Design a protein with these regions (language model features):
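Extended soluble regions of mature proteins
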Residues: 21-224
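Bacterial N-terminal signal peptides that target proteins for export
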Residues: 1-7
């Protein structure tokens, strides 16, 4: 079960949001196509659908099994669906027991890199985050859009410091591109939006199928 969440987390490495007319805001409704690439592995496409601030992420799990996740910012929760198993899990990030970010202000620092760039025709602002370990992340973000990144569940994932997943969620800073580097400067992972389509999205895309079984997430082991 943990592997299923990890697979989706990797696919959502730095999920992005952009809009038609070279602009994006909280009212955007439509689909976004992006590609995530992990070092040594083939690029993996992912489709995201947005409606009323909610986000649905469709990707492939282990063995190519279909999976999707739905993030509801009003509840601060993510529902992870294993479609081939007709099962789902609910991750409530408003609870004190929710998984914590992988980095902290004590081990990383984030700052504006200066300047802007354009991703999929959308203007974004450059930020960089550096960790005391030597790792760094470069992101290009837009502001004012809901964000959630499941990489905060992935053990050992490089964080974004002051513009990390939790901080970005709170500040509504959404990355259109994210690139991770290790201490030697080698690229670890990359996510980038490739296409945007502004259109109506059916409400049923965010509804839990009636025949899906809810799975309970086992409690995390006690820390020594």
């Amino acid at each position: 079960m943990r592997n299923h969440v990890a697979v989706l987390a990797l696919a959502l490495s730095a999920s992005s949001l952009c809009g038609c007319a070279k602009k994006i805001d909280a009212t955007f409704e439509g689909t976004i196509t992006m590609t995530t690439t992990l070092a040594g592995k083939a690029p993996q496409p992912m489709m995201m659908e947005i409606k009323n601030g909610r986000m649905r992420f469709d990707t492939l799990g282990e063995g190519g099994a279909p999976m999707h996740g739905v993030y509801d910012p009003t509840r601060n929760e993510v529902m992870v669906f294993m479609d081939s198993q007709k099962a789902y899990m609910t991750l409530d990030f408003s609870r004190a027991t929710a998984p914590a970010p992988n980095t902290s202000a004590e081990t990383s620092i984030a700052e504006k890199a200066g300047g802007k760039d354009e991703v999929a025709g959308i203007s974004c602002e450059k930020w960089v985050s550096k960790e005391t370990s030597g790792k760094r992340s470069e992101v290009c973000v837009i502001e004012g859009v809901n964000f959630f990144d499941l990489t905060r569940l992935r053990a050992g994932a490089a964080g974004l410091g002051g513009v990390g997943p939790q901080s970005m969620q709170e500040k509504k800073m959404f990355p259109l591109r994210s690139v991770e580097y290790d201490a030697s400067g080698a690229e670890i992972s990359r996510m980038e939006v490739t296409a945007v389509d502004k259109k109506a999205v059916d409400e049923s895309r965010f509804v839990t199928p009636a025949d899906y079984k809810k799975l309970e997430i086992p409690p995390a082991p006690a820390q020594p």
